UniProtKB/Swiss-Prot annotation:
InterPro entries: Archease, Archease_arc, Archease_dom, Archease_dom_sf. The lineage of its organism: Archaea, Methanobacteriati, Methanobacteriota, Thermococci, Thermococcales. Belongs to the archease family. This is Protein archease. The keyword Metal-binding applies. One of its GO terms (molecular function) is calcium ion binding. It comes from Thermococcus gammatolerans (strain DSM 15229 / JCM 11827 / EJ3). Activates the tRNA-splicing ligase complex by facilitating the enzymatic turnover of catalytic subunit RtcB. Acts by promoting the guanylylation of RtcB, a key intermediate step in tRNA ligation. Can also alter the NTP specificity of RtcB such that ATP, dGTP or ITP is used efficiently.
Length: 142
């Protein structure tokens, strides 16, 4: 089961996602990112976008994935309330394919909170927990 939470981090806010798989943890942290900006429970899956990134390690993969979602937000005004991820190991690292569904930001409906300026590597961690779940976290630039 995927879930996310926000955690306090000096002047900013951290985003932490959990899942029973690595993919679910990536999905949860992506939803947590958008929940920093809007109430994702109010986002309907009216439009979907596909994202594909390849990187040498998991941290770079998470960074590039979240960056692609943020670019879609900045360029098309989209906010996402559902994200599905597939990650596969490749010869040179990892490949991620994702389908993100949401809608164009509506200020009345979605009640914007914070503006995320950029994805960062700050406090980024991806690990398998002792209970077998996966956790992924980072601190966005607000």
């Amino acid at each position: 089961m995927r879930r996310w939470e926000h955690y306090e981090h000096t002047a900013d806010i951290g985003v932490r996602g959990y899942g029973s798989t690595l993919e679910e943890a990536f999905e949860a942290v992506a939803l947590g990112l958008f929940d920093v900006m809007v109430d994702v429970r109010k986002v309907e899956p009216r439009e979907c976008r596909e994202v594909e990134v390849e990187e040498e390690d998991l941290e770079a993969l998470l960074y590039s994935f979240l960056e692609e979602l943020l670019v879609l937000h900045d360029m098309e005004g989209l906010v996402f309330g559902d994200v599905r991820v597939r990650i596969e190991k490749t010869e040179n690292g990892y490949r991620l394919k994702a389908k993100a569904c949401g809608e164009v930001l509506d200020y009345e409906k979605h009640e914007p909170k914070e503006e995320v300026k950029a994805i960062t590597y700050h406090d980024m961690r991806i690990e398998k927990l002792p209970d077998g779940r996966w956790m992924a976290q980072f601190v966005p630039d607000l």
